[in-house]
Amino acid sequence: MSSNVIEIYADGACKGNPGPGGWGAWLSFAGHEKELWGGELVTTNNRMELTAVIRALEALKRQCSVRIYTDSVYVQKGITEWVHSWKARNWLTSDRKPVKNVDLWKALDSLVQQHQVEWVWVKGHAGNVGNERADALANKGVDQVLGREVV
């Protein structure tokens, strides 16, 4: 782990798709850690995956070098590959349909312009400690919106 890079593990969870969902992010920098989580009563897994990354980037107080770990190919490819074409087509897909979750994609696109971001895809539920922590936080977000006790 490089000490001058903020490492972010982000994950989303959904009980039903759509259904109640949660997002979680674990930030680590120079021995300091921060946990973020939340949720929505009616959402989708993709919205929660995007929200996790957005909330993590919003928590940064200044321009930073950031390494974001996600198990969502949708988020990773969306922001590194697809977003450029979407913007060129005024937020339409290649078959001229509106991009889903455009509100979140626009927010994420704006936030990544403010930082130096490296995107790393990790396999979900495969024992990666950071990803497991983000997953637990996302599930905490689900529990919170469902009124379950959050520990």
From Swiss-Prot:
Protein name according to UniProt: Ribonuclease H
Subcellular location: Cytoplasm
Enzyme Commission designation: 3.1.26.4
HAMAP family: RNase_H
Gene name per UniProt: rnhA
Its biological purpose: Endonuclease that specifically degrades the RNA of RNA-DNA hybrids.
Organism of origin: Methylobacillus flagellatus (strain ATCC 51484 / DSM 6875 / VKM B-1610 / KT)
Keyword 4Fe-4S set for record: no
Catalytic activity: Endonucleolytic cleavage to 5'-phosphomonoester
Residues bound to Mg(2+) 1: 11, 49, 71
Cofactor(s) the record lists: Mg(2+)
One Pfam family per UniProt: RNase_H
GO terms classed as biological process: DNA replication, removal of RNA primer
Highest classification ranks of the organism: Bacteria, Pseudomonadati, Pseudomonadota, Betaproteobacteria, Nitrosomonadales
Principal EC category: hydrolase
Complex formation: Monomer.
GO molecular-function terms, A-Z: magnesium ion binding; nucleic acid binding; RNA-DNA hybrid ribonuclease activity
Gene Ontology cellular component annotations, sorted alphabetically: cytoplasm
Positions annotated to bind Mg(2+) 2: 11, 135
Alphabetized SUPFAM superfamilies for the sequence: Ribonuclease H-like (SSF53098)
Family: Belongs to the RNase H family.
This protein's UniProt keywords: Cytoplasm, Endonuclease, Hydrolase, Magnesium, Metal-binding, Nuclease
Cofactor binding summary note: Binds 1 Mg(2+) ion per subunit. May bind a second metal ion at a regulatory site, or after substrate binding.
Every RNase H type-1 domain range: 2-143
